[in-house]
Amino acid sequence: DAVITINSNLGEYQVPVHAEITDDGIQTSRGAVDNLEAFIKLAESDYREAFRLYTSESFLKVLQGEDPGYESLYRGMSRNPVTYQHMEEFLIGTGKKEPVTLRLEKTEQTWDHLDTTVKDCLNLYKSTWGYTRMEVEVTGDFLEVEKKVITSEDFIGSVYGLEYLIRKEKLGSGRKYGQ
C-alpha cells in the first residue's frame, strides 16, 4: 500500500494506492499458458502461436514446476535454427504427445490401356495433430507429382490428397512399373 500526494494551489490531497501483482502466466490468444498442459492445448489448436511461444525467452516459465528433464530436453531442442520439427520432437520427448504417423488409402494402383495422360489422387492420412514434413519422390519417368514437399499445413483435417499424373507420352509400349 502507498499514498500519492498531490499538492496544488487548491490544497493538498492524498490518494491511497493498493497494487497487487500476480503472475497469470503467459498470455496468448487462447488464454494464459502457465504450464506444459496449457502449452500442449495451445499447440493442438494453434501450432504457429505455440511455436512463437516455444521460441521466446518466456517459454522456460512454462516448464517451471515440471519434470526437471524437460528443461534439458527443451535446451537441446531449441538450438538455432529452431524449426517446427524441433518443437514436435520436444512435445513427443515429454511423453505428452503421440508422434504423427502416416497411412496411405491404398498401396497399389493398376492402369490398363491409357489413351491419354491421367491425373489421379491418392489420399494420405495422418494419425494425430502435430507437425510433419515429407518429401515425395517417384520412380518412373512417366509419373509426376504436383507437390514434392508436403507439410502438416497442407492437410485438411487429417487428410491430404496427393495428386499425381501418369504421362501417356512417356509410357512407350509394354508394362511399366512406378512408385
Residues covered by each model-derived region:
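Short coil/turn segments at secondary-structure boundaries
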Residues: 2, 18-19, 150, 178
